[in-house]
Each structure stands twice: as C-alpha cells, then as structure tokens.
Amino acid sequence: MSQEKYIMAIDQGTTSSRAIIFNKKGEKVSSSQKEFTQIFPQAGWVEHNANEIWNSVQSVIAGAFIESGVKPNQIEAIGITNQRETTVVWDKKTGLPIYNAIVWQSRQTAPLAEQLKSQGYVEKFHEKTGLIIDAYFSATKVRWILDHVEGAQERAEKGELLFGTIDTWLVWKLTDGAAHVTDYSNAARTMLYNIKELKWDDEILEILNIPKAILPEVRSNSEIYGKTAPFHFYGGEVPISGMAGDQQAALFGQLAFEPGMVKNTYGTGSFIIMNTGEEMQLSENNLLTTIGYGINGKVYYALEGSIFIAGSAIQWLRDGLRMVENSPESEKYARDSHNNDEVYVVPAFTGLGAPYWNQNARGSVFGLTRGTSKEDFIKATLQSIAYQVRDIIDTMQMDTQTAIQVLKVDGGAAMNNFLMQFQADILGIDIARAKNLETTALGAAFLAGLSVGYWKDLDELKLLNETGELFEPSMNESRKEQLYKGWKKAVKATQVFAEVDD
C-alpha cells in the first residue's frame, strides 16, 4: 500500500464538510465528515462562519488520513466541490472575512433583488448570466456585505478585499493566499458572469457597483489551480486540480457527458441538471441556464431546476416536528400510511424555487381530515419532493423539446426506496440510482484526476460508476395525473395565500 496513489475530494456542503479519499477504481477508501454551525440572525437569513468552514475542512482532511493510513505524499491531486452561491468577502492582507458567509438559502438580500427587477433588469441579466434575478445568487449578497460593513466599499475599490464563493475561499486558504481563482460552474452562479462570453460582465458590475478588483480569476473545471501550502496539508505540496459547484460535480460524477442526460441530487435542496451540450440554451419557462463544466478547451452548458427544500423537509420532520427519530425511518412510516394520497404538503419554507420562483410563499398543508395520521403526513412530505421534481422535469421537456427517458439520481434521500418508487411513478420514467451515491465528491475527484493523468480520459471514467438500482414506474396514467393535478392545486393555493394584501 505504501506507494499506491489516490485522489482526495473535499466536499464542502451546506451543513457539513467532508474529505473523501478515492482509489483508481473510483472506490471510497476513507472519509471524514464534520458539521458546522448554522447561523440565523433573523427570520429567513442563513449565514456561516467562513473561518469555521475552513477549520472543519482542515479537520476532515486529517480525519481521512487517519482513517485510511494514507500519507499526504500518496495523494496525487485534490478536487474541490462546494455549496454554490454562498458568498465570502475577506481582507486580502489578514485573510479574515469581514462578515459571515451569506448562504445560498438566505433571503436577506431579497429587497435588493426586487429593486433590480423593478428597475427593469430581468431580461438583461437573463441573457447575460442565464439566471433569473433572485437573492439566491451571489451578486446581491456581495452588494449587501459591501453596503452593511463599514468602509467595505472603499476598501474593495482600493483592492484591499477579495470576494469568492466557497471554492475560491478554500483554494485561497489551502494555497496560503497564492491562488485567487474560481471555475466556470461556480462563476456561472454569481449572477456577475457572462456565460456566453465567458467573462465577468462589466455592465452588471457597474449596475451593482461591485469593483472588479475583488473578483477571482475564472478557470476551467479540470486544471492545476495551485498547490497546497505544506503546513496546511501535513507536509504535502499537492496540486489542487479539479473544481466544480456541487450540482455540476454530481452531473460529472454521474457520467452525464452526453447532451440530453439528466441527473437529480436529493440533498438539502434538490437540483436537477440536464447537459445541453456546447450550445447555450435560454429557458422560456423559468429554469436556469448555467455552465455544466468546461474541460479540454470546451464548455458544456446545462439547464437547471432548483428545489430549495428536499432532504431538509425530512430533517424538519425529525428536528422540527419530532415525528421521526432519524431520516431513514420516514420510509417505514410512509409505507404504513394507508390513505388515498389526498394530503399534500407544500414545503415552501424559504419560498418556491423553479419553475415558480415565488420568494414570498411559505409552507402549507392541504387535505387534512380528522382521520389523517402521522404516517399520512410523513408520506405526503416525501411525496412533495417527488412532485417538485416532476414540475422541473416537465419544464425541461418543454424547453428542450426532448422526451427524458431516464433520470439518474444520487444524494442522501435517493436512499429512500419509497421516495424513488413514487418518483418513478409520478414521472412515468425509469429512475437509475447510482451504485456509488458519492457522485458529488466523485465528480470532483474525476475532474482532479483527469487533469494530472491519474485517469486517462472520459472513456476510462465511464467504467467507474454504473447504475446500482433501477426503479420502474408502476402507477397507471389516470391515477398519476390525478395526483399531480392535486399537487398543482396545492401550489396554486400556497401562492394565493402568500399574496401581499393591499
């Protein structure tokens, strides 16, 4: 074992950081995970302490080495994947953040987003960035920090501050400030990057008054960005050579290299991405156009639908309502429910994502009767995840005029067999669950390994992550459509309830 080589993936997520060591077969050799604090300064605000994130990453790197006995000099390369859009602004000299990281879920910049919309910028931003104007993306978060931290705008203009999404922050820390870089997939989520021209957009920067000096350099998803400073990697100087936002990394880890391939990751939120090839395709139905990945001098675009609440709805059942002891238990309860699926939960806790984009909507429940049981409620919560996925798959098919035949799935909630079967039923297509559910980390490892020759090419990768289980639809058409119609009514009613009174 002494001289076998490995790839390390650092997967910095919304609630925890992980380091995973993979071997040449794409198998997990060891992993380490550490949760960190979620900060909620006000209703709807979500923040993280960027230093705590960095500490958690250092801790899991150590943990992965300890668990496996692998030495730092056996790591051929490091791949990074991260929660996207989450925004850090820090002091170039001290390396200290000037404010907490504002998390992708946070709605604290919603008034800024509304202001941009009312000023008539929707079309312009969509054409340039592929995104809709929303507090979800980094642009308004950067503006908010520069507005709310005393002297920040002035310091930014003087070039004393740096901005980055979490990938940028981690590379900057790991290289001890030698590299201030991001990749196509993360840059595409800032709402500051022109995805057609592949550059920071001067006009948008001017509209938001964000100084260009604070922005990182944008690079491809598979190349050497820098090397670890030995004192941050237990004596090792290892190339950091692959980087992608978590959802794009999962697309790559699912081996969705062909246009028309679609994957869904059931994480905290649920994110459905379709590879649309080298042509940028703007959605007419409120999906996001983004960059899937850029590799070997080519850029592959993607359509994406974001669902804000998926796995976190199960966490809510566990922590908020205390209906289940642990997440897997939700499957048992759902199977014990014998109602006729007339209960609908719309988990719009932080608004509705694609294709509705209603940031004022809040969670609601419909169809309760005196006979409704805890089991029925848990089942309806699981079903809400599948209904939201159907909303997006239907929209993708409209946008691209293609019939999606199979959905590749991964992420924590993809382990729930009840949910996967109901997903197949309500979509009427096959659900292919990856054998290796670590597709996000695997994608980052693949990108890193390719750029240093650890794996030769995409064909070699295709042998490494086959389908683990296939779920085929078994519900008849009229029942499927009747259930989905009920969901559409529930969403409509939720939006009516959220309307602002005159």
UniProtKB/Swiss-Prot annotation:
InterPro entries: ATPase_NBD (IPR043129), Carb_kinase_FGGY (IPR000577), Carb_kinase_FGGY_CS (IPR018483), FGGY_C (IPR018485), FGGY_N (IPR018484), Glycerol_kin (IPR005999). One of its GO terms (biological process) is glycerol catabolic process. This is Glycerol kinase. Activated by phosphorylation and inhibited by fructose 1,6-bisphosphate (FBP). It is an enzyme of class 2 (transferase). It comes from Streptococcus pneumoniae (strain Hungary19A-6). Keywords: ATP-binding, Glycerol metabolism, Kinase, Nucleotide-binding, Phosphoprotein, Transferase. The modification Phosphohistidine is found at H232. Its EC number is 2.7.1.30. Sn-glycerol 3-phosphate binds at T14, R84, E85, Y136, D246. Homotetramer and homodimer (in equilibrium). Disulfide bonds: none annotated. Key enzyme in the regulation of glycerol uptake and metabolism. Catalyzes the phosphorylation of glycerol to yield sn-glycerol 3-phosphate. ADP binds at T14, R18, T268, G311, G412, N416. The keyword Secreted does not apply. Belongs to the FGGY kinase family. GO terms for molecular function: ATP binding; glycerol kinase activity.
